Every structure is written in structure tokens, then in C-alpha cells.
Amino acid sequence: HYKNNMYTTVIDGEDYAIKPMNCPGGMLVYASEPHSYRDLPLRVGELGLVHRHELSGALHGLFRVRCFTQDDAHIFMTREQMESEIQNVVRLFDEVYNVFGLKYTVELSTMPEDHIGTVEEWEANQEILKKAITGMGKDFVVNEGDGAFYGPKLDFHIEDCLGRTWQCGTIQLDSQLPERFNLEYTGEDGQKHRPVMIHRVVFGSIERFIGVITEHFAGAFPLWLTPVQVKVLPVTDRAHEYAKGLTQKLVDAGIRAEDDCRSEKLGYKIREAQMQKIPYMLVVGDRDMENGTVSVRTRKGEDLGAMTMDAFLSKCLSEIASKSKDI
């Protein structure tokens, strides 16, 4: 099913391939030791690097690449646990996407022509996905024939600030690969049973999600997310040591801060920091050194005036802890 998109080679007469998906590894982790019904649900997560030979014309920045990182998890469970586990994953999606202020729509992707397993199994699993998502009061649309080859799935399409949608999260219900890998658990009756499995990703491709949120925020990330949160800008050479001390205090408090002690005009340094979307700029001069204060500016050009370093630290740490989107 993935052969045409895989990178393969032959070494000493043996065929080798770079993995295009993480799923077989999840199967092998489960199969590495015996399991009882008491172990289930068993949730196995990883950040796995995968390679897929996409056509060159389909490649698009961070959005479509040939090597990317998936935040994969494989959840092994009994049939009785399927609905609650699906809903647990949806709650995880809500928690993560809400942090970024992202809305989503849901698609139920059904059995493709090129599938494994019986029609009856597919229909039963599709009904479980429907029941789980509607039981949470969420709407969905049906995407006929777009399921994975091993099972139906719920696809979560997040919407960016331009109204574009990107498929990121997915919940794939799979009773086929546990069969192919001969996975088992010992039931309450002492007999061997076959588990069922969920494949889930929240971000999908980490690289693509970074691209999505970069465009969504137009580079002006919330304070908690931005790579450099504070830039300290001394007005004169006399304030360099004071600026460096402030920067170190910020770093010691866990804030990502830098100072700009170049011999450039203050206006130039402020404009450059604004272009870099730095949330806060601390302008420090002779008066600030005398009073032990900092003059605070935002990337939007707002002048918040002078405040003590402790007051500014408290403000920053509060915004970071709350994951505030306002800056």
C-alpha cells in the first residue's frame, strides 16, 4: 500500500526500506510481552520520523515534505473500550487546539476500494466512530471512500486565520493490523482475544503544524510560544551592563530573552525587534538605571511606560502560565 512512496535500497542482497509510517513499530512494542485485559487500554506514544517519496510538484514549504515527524500514538483496547477511548482522544484534541485558538471541522472517512478486512467489520467500526463523535455533541460530514486501507477514521481539519483548512488530527480505528500481527491479550475468561487499536495523531506532521500556526499568527506568536519573548535595548553604552544584567535575570526566571547592545540607533533596534515580532522590548537608559526600572514597549508599538523589573517579570510569567493569546 505504501510501496510506491517508499525509499528502498539493497544491501548485501537484502532489501531495506526507510519507514513511511510508525504503525508497525507500535505493533512490535505491544507484541514484545504478553498482556492481560487488566493492561488495557494500553497507550503507546512516540514522536516518529517518517519518509515518503512525494512527487516534486506536490512539495510545498513545511506543508508537504518528504521527511517529517509524526506525534503518533497507538492505543490497544477491548471492543467495549472503543467508544470511550475515541472520546478521550477527541478531548485531547480540544485541549490542544484550544490553546492555539484553533477551530476545527470533523470528517468521517469511510471504506476505500483498496482495503483489507470484511465489509461487515468496516461498517461496525464506522458506526462506533459515528456514535462516539455524536455522543459528544459534535457534527461531522462523511468523506466517502477516503479511509485508511486498514480502517475508517475521523479527520480533524483545523482552520487558520485566512479561512483555509488543514487536516491535522486523525483517529483511525483498526481491527486489521492487530490481526495481521497476531496480537493477543488474555481475557477475564482466561482465553486469548484479539485487541482492537486506534491510531491517533494530534498535530499530524509537526512540521506542517508549525507552518500552519506560523501563518495563522502571521509570525506574531503568543508570548508563551514565541522563540524570543523579550528583547532588552540599552539607549547608551553606559546602560550595556545594566541591560545584560536584566537579560540574565529574565533568563534565570525561565523567559527567553536577548539583549541588543550593538552600536545602532535606538529607533533602528526597536523597528528591527518589531519586525522580528518580539512581544516585549525593554528600553533602558540612565534614568532606568537610577530608578531600577525598565521602559516597556510592545511589538504593536504600545508604550506601557516604566515599571520595576519584578513587576514586569510577574506580568510576563502570568501571561505565559495562562497561555494568553493577547499581545
Provide a role label for each language-model segment.
Residues 1-327:
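NTP/phosphate- and nucleic-acid-binding module
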